[in-house]
């Protein structure tokens, strides 16, 4: 049975950025992706925001994100992704292992 939703993974810089700003940027990215008209399906953003991950180190976050990337129909990279180490790794995983498409939010 085909999934009735388009599962979107959003990759974005998070280090040193407040949760509020991260959520704001994700919403902007979601709206941008919707405006592309890529799919007629309902868009489900994969929840990779790990707010309460006490004791996690950078590679813990990254390993969780890599697992979630495997479930994506598409991956959206938000502005300045190329300045964040984790996003660079996510890009390589998306490029070589995700069956969906890769989208880039334009820089302003």
Language model regions located:
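Conserved catalytic or regulatory cores that recognize and/or transform ribose-phosphate-containing ligands
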Residues: 1-108
